[in-house]
Amino acid sequence: MESLLRFLALLLLRGAVAEGPAKKVLTLEGDLVLGGLFPVHQKGGPAEECGPVNEHRGIQRLEAMLFALDRINRDPHLLPGVRLGAHILDSCSKDTHALEQALDFVRASLSRGADGSRHICPDGSYATLSDAPTAITGVIGGSYSDVSIQVANLLRLFQIPQISYASTSAKLSDKSRYDYFARTVPPDFFQAKAMAEILRFFNWTYVSTVASEGDYGETGIEAFELEARARNICVATSEKVGRAMSRAAFEGVVRALLQKPSARVAVLFTRSEDARELLAATQRLNASFTWVASDGWGALESVVAGSERAAEGAITIELASYPISDFASYFQNLDPWNNSRNPWFREFWEERFRCSFRQRDCAAHSLRAVPFEQESKIMFVVNAVYAMAHALHNMHRALCPNTTRLCDAMRPVNGRRLYKDFVLNVKFDAPFRPADTDDEVRFDRFGDGIGRYNIFTYLRAGNGRYRYQKVGYWAEGLTLDTSIIPWASPSAGTLPASRCSEPCLQNEVKSVQPGEVCCWLCIPCQPYEYRLDEFTCADCGLGYWPNASLTGCFELPQEYIRWGDAWAVGPVTIACLGALATLFVLGVFVRHNATPVVKASGRELCYILLGGVFLCYCMTFIFIAKPSTAVCTLRRLGLGTAFSVCYSALLTKTNRIARIFGGAREGAQRPRFISPASQVAICLALISGQLLIVAAWLVVEAPGIGKETAPERREVVTLRCNHRDASMLGSLAYNVLLIALCTLYAFKTRKCPENFNEAKFIGFTMYTTCIIWLAFLPIFYVTSSDYRVQTTTMCVSVSLSGSVVLGCLFAPKLHIILFQPQKNVVSHRAPTSRFGSAAPRASANLGQGSGSQLVPTVCNGREVVDSTTSSL
């Protein structure tokens, strides 16, 4: 197959030689000849093959190869006895033209196989080339990646090693296709990574891209987009610039970029000529972008000339290199008379000084008299030539150990062995490096150089002139000094923005639009949610609340009424005063235990009633106390029991009065169970009913504590007893029944003045109690969402219930005992039974005898006679 391809190349070569015009070639004689391929001219327009002379990337790089060859040939330690020659061609910055030129490199190989044997034509004769040049040992070049790719595809057929000094396409690292290619520069994916890191450094997440057609631009921008996606950077629009685009076409590209106003940053992976035209179109349209450009732009003045305003603020990348002072001296001393070996130098001279040798006005000029800017890749050209020389030197030492001349083993040079065994394994200190620089020339297993880039910004200096300023470098990581960049320095204020959507606030997450990872809507999290990530709000859960940074949750403190709270001070004060008042009443009753008022009130039931009132006041302290299992048990037990003690005693009293006077109306016998012991037993039986209900409640719903959070106030966690408010209502239902019955009896006996009108006062007590309960129960259940209001309502209501008993029932008795003692005496009455009607005889004898008198009593419209003072 390779023989067939070589034969086809031979036919193409003969056609090119027969039909093509005469071309310029730089030839230097030598024992071993190195080919050279340089863009001496820029690419031409549609009607011409080549354009103007390319001073920096063409002439300077070509002269750098000649400079390196001169130094090598004079070096007694590198290839001594072997002289290196050159066969240098012009690529005109076009891959097709370069491929035509590169056929010169393989002409000498077309008549021989890889093993040196001569090719045999189909008719049996040997293939011959009458004007075949010296065989090319290796090639230095080309510059552009698409040129190197085309040439590499040709050279590999003839096993000719190739070392490029500027081609950075990632495709060239594929050793299955470019197995004789190496380069002293790193591949573009390092540069693409550096550019993506620059964008991420400035938080530019939405950018446009422009790439030159061809392998350099297209593969470079593909590598950049891959690195950008890994860093969540999105491309708004991707544009390409062609080889022969008109000014209008470049303006169309700029207008396309302007269609994405949020993408203020444009990433360029273009050749220098395309970058120059794009900047010119931008300036004509008075547009403005922040450019981030590859080494195709680099730090070239020719790119920005005439478009300085459009280029201002750009960030560009250039392979890290250092100027070679010896080359600067060499180049500045050149002129057309001492550099006749370079056939393009006279043309360069005329364009550089705008003179003409026909008019003899070029002799007065000198390169030493004009500013000199050394092209940034001169170092890589020199390193490429030295790498080939070191590889040949090592090969010579291995194959020709006994001579400094070429031996038969290197006639011709085996290109496969030269590349595999010597070029890829070469390692030496870079020539002409500064003393403080540690620069080693070597290749990795893909034939690539080591990656390090300098980063520049194009700025306007204080004198109004524009210049490139180095602001950092990239070597497996980004280092930037933003204080040098005018728009990024601290004094500049806000950085230029290039993003599709504004950053979300701390309490918001991104709702990404389909297909646009850089475009989103900001959705606020709920107050009880934290940010699980930048796209998700997560519920903290009941009892937890997001921290200040919304990165997690913390457990909310448990809230309950504390003794020092305003919500506790009022109820506790009322309870304390009520308890003291109860103890005072108890003390007065005990002190006057044998007096008629106390005896007539039913001492045993009064003491039980005072105990219930005191328990009502004590319940305030239990409800204010911090909830615990014991406290919750006491709450359940104490609340219903306190009420049942009070209302059981009152019910027993009113029931007794009702039965007594009910029997008197009907003339019945003395009612049963009206003795003190019976009354206490009835009261205790009624209380035990409440105790049984509470006991069942405690069994069915075990007491304990729980955390409660209202849906509308999740930031508040209340420490509460675990019983339900409905179950509390069930416990109080029994007391409601007692109150209803007690109120009924109080109403029935309201006109009975027995025992100092006690029935009337019991009625007042029950009426007021009903009002309190009718107000308390709705408030208690309506305020269930606010534990403080509910607890305070409960405490005040319970205390009021006790206070009503004290005020309405005991206060009148206390008033008689303390302030009307004359009423607190025994009244003598006739020994007539309470349950018999007063006889006329007794009435006639009223006031006679022993002084006893009958006191008529009217109860509910019936007159009865009471012969006793004490009810018990």
From Swiss-Prot:
Species, as recorded: Mus musculus (Mouse)
Keyword Signal: yes
Example GO biological process: regulation of response to drug
Membrane topology, Cytoplasmic segments: 590-604, 652-679, 748-760, 820-872
GO molecular function: calcium channel regulator activity; group II metabotropic glutamate receptor activity; scaffold protein binding
Protein name as catalogued: Metabotropic glutamate receptor 2
Membrane as UniProt keyword: yes
Phylogenetic placement of the source organism: Eukaryota, Metazoa, Chordata, Craniata, Vertebrata
Tissue: Detected in neurons in brain cortex (at protein level).
PROSITE patterns referenced in this protein's UniProt entry, alphabetically: G_PROTEIN_RECEP_F3_1, G_PROTEIN_RECEP_F3_2, G_PROTEIN_RECEP_F3_3, G_PROTEIN_RECEP_F3_4
Annotated keywords: Cell membrane, Cell projection, Disulfide bond, G-protein coupled receptor, Glycoprotein, Membrane, Receptor, Signal, Synapse, Transducer, Transmembrane, Transmembrane helix
Function according to Swiss-Prot or TrEMBL: Dimeric G protein-coupled receptor which is activated by the excitatory neurotransmitter L-glutamate. Plays critical roles in modulating synaptic transmission and neuronal excitability. Upon activation by glutamate, inhibits presynaptic calcium channels, reducing further glutamate release and dampening excitatory signaling. Mechanistically, ligand binding causes a conformation change that triggers signaling via guanine nucleotide-binding proteins (G proteins) and modulates the activity of down-stream effectors, such as adenylate cyclase.
Disruption phenotype: Grm2-deletion mice are healthy and show no obvious alteration in physical characteristics. However, they show reduced mossy fiber long-term depression and locomotor hyperactivity under novel environmental and stressful conditions. Furthermore, grm2-null mutation leads to altered responses in several behavioral tests, including a significant increase in cocaine-induced behaviors associated with reinforcement and addiction.
Residue segments, region Important for interaction with HTR2A: 677-685
PANTHER family per the UniProt record, alphabetical: METABOTROPIC GLUTAMATE RECEPTOR
Annotated L-glutamate binding sites: R57, R61, S145, A166, T168, D295, K377
Cystine bridges: C50-C92, C234-C518, C355-C362, C400-C407, C500-C519, C504-C522, C525-C537, C540-C553, C632-C721
GO cellular component: astrocyte projection; axon; dendrite; glutamatergic synapse; neuron projection; postsynaptic membrane; presynaptic membrane
Cellular compartments annotated: Cell membrane; Synapse; Cell projection, Dendrite
InterPro entries tied to this protein: ANF_lig-bd_rcpt, GPCR_3, GPCR_3_9-Cys_dom, GPCR_3_9-Cys_sf, GPCR_3_C, GPCR_3_CS, GPCR_3_mGluR2, GPCR_3_mtglu_rcpt
Subunit structure: Forms heterodimers with GRM3 or GRM4. Interacts with GNAI1. Interacts with TAMALIN. Interacts with HTR2A.
Pfam families in the record: 7tm_3 (PF00003), ANF_receptor (PF01094), NCD3G (PF07562)
Signal peptide positions (record): 1-18
